[in-house]
Amino acid sequence: MERLAFKMKLNKGQKQAYKERHDQLWPELKQLLKDNGVSEYSIFIDEETNTLFAFQKVSGHGGSQDLANNEIVKKWWDFMADIMQVNPDNSPVSIPLEEVFYME
């Protein structure tokens, strides 16, 4: 099991919309993530900077970051693009984070 972490940026004032959309995560997206080895996925927010910190436990390679060509993922990106910083293809601007400590 591999642990992955990355950060994204939420637009100012969009915390509630972000939370509401994720509270109603599409079942087909959730299943896609599970089918591609994502067993745990958490996202935290630093409200001072609107930085989102995501953490995933994955088996296999890459987790959600390898699903960029999937139509369900692309539709989710389009759905989320108005409330967060995105690339030209509407994928979230995502910066991988290096693990510097782990305790089991």
UniProtKB/Swiss-Prot annotation:
The protein's annotated catalytic reaction(s) are: alpha-L-rhamnose = beta-L-rhamnose
| E.C. designation(s) | 5.1.3.32
The metabolic or biological pathway listed in the UniProt record of this protein is:
Carbohydrate metabolism; L-rhamnose metabolism
List the keywords (alphabetical). Carbohydrate metabolism, Cytoplasm, Isomerase, Rhamnose metabolism
Disulfide bonds listed in the record: none
Cited function: L-rhamnose mutarotase involved in ulvan degradation. Ulvan is the main polysaccharide component of the Ulvales (green seaweed) cell wall. It is composed of disaccharide building blocks comprising 3-sulfated rhamnose (Rha3S) linked to D-glucuronic acid (GlcA), L-iduronic acid (IduA), or D-xylose (Xyl). L-rhamnose mutarotase catalyzes the anomeric conversion of alpha- to beta-L-rhamnose.
**GO CC, alphabetical:** cytoplasm
One biological process term from GO is:
rhamnose catabolic process
Q: What GO annotations for molecular function exist for this entry? A: L-rhamnose mutarotase activity
Task: Name a Pfam family for this protein.
Answer: rhaM
Signal peptide limits: none
Where substrate binds, per the record, is at 18, 41, 76-77
Q: How does it assemble?
A: Homodimer.
Location of the active site: 22
Name used for this protein in its record: L-rhamnose mutarotase
Q: What class of enzyme is it?
A: isomerase
Q: Where in the cell is it found?
A: Cytoplasm
Q: Which InterPro entries match?
A: Dimeric_a/b-barrel, L-rhamnose_mutarotase, Rham/fucose_mutarotase
